[in-house]
């Protein structure tokens, strides 16, 4: 009578299905979500913004500016635009384009069409920076505001605000 062998599947006989730890560590290092990234304070965000502004002004003493504001659908943006425009005029900056106004309310900055157009203008070197009344034109959440600053700085642009981050 022939002998049949029954193979039993156990943890000891299973083929390893885990990637080695170095692969996991590599992937995790790339995927640091904002929720576990330490939040920067308003003062730290102000320092980041001002460093970018100083760097850009040293390269271009009379930069070309795009004016930006975000308001609720029923709000008039005139006051916010006037304050941002006044900031640009006081500093002798050039107003290169029509103001960009998003009537989206406090949505994530990456979803706003007029802000995207200004970022594209930075990419195409049509403007050197963005002027706004306050950081709340971008976000009142530090993580979203930091992301917006990073997007602007990655394009060698700057953000100039009429009020400081600690004034929100």
Model-found features: residue ranges?
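Short, structured surface patches at the beginning of a domain
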Residues: 1-168
């Amino acid at each position: 009578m022939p002998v049949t062998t029954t193979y039993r599947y156990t943890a000891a006989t299973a083929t390893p299905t885990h990637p080695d730890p170095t692969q996991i560590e590599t992937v995790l290092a790339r995927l640091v979500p904002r929720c576990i990234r330490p939040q920067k304070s308003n003062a730290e965000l102000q320092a980041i913004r001002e460093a970018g502004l100083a760097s850009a002004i040293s390269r271009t003493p009379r930069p070309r500016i795009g004016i930006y504001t975000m308001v609720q659908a029923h709000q008039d943006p005139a006051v916010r635009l006037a304050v941002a425009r006044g900031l640009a005029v006081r500093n002798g900056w050039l107003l290169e384009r029509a103001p960009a106004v998003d009537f989206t309310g406090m949505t994530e900055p990456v979803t706003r069409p007029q802000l995207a157009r200004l970022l594209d203008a930075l990419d195409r070197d049509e403007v050197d920076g963005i002027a706004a009344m306050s950081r709340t034109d971008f976000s009142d959440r530090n993580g979203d505001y930091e992301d917006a600053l990073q997007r602007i700085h990655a394009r060698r642009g700057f953000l100039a605000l009429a009020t400081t981050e600690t004034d929100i």
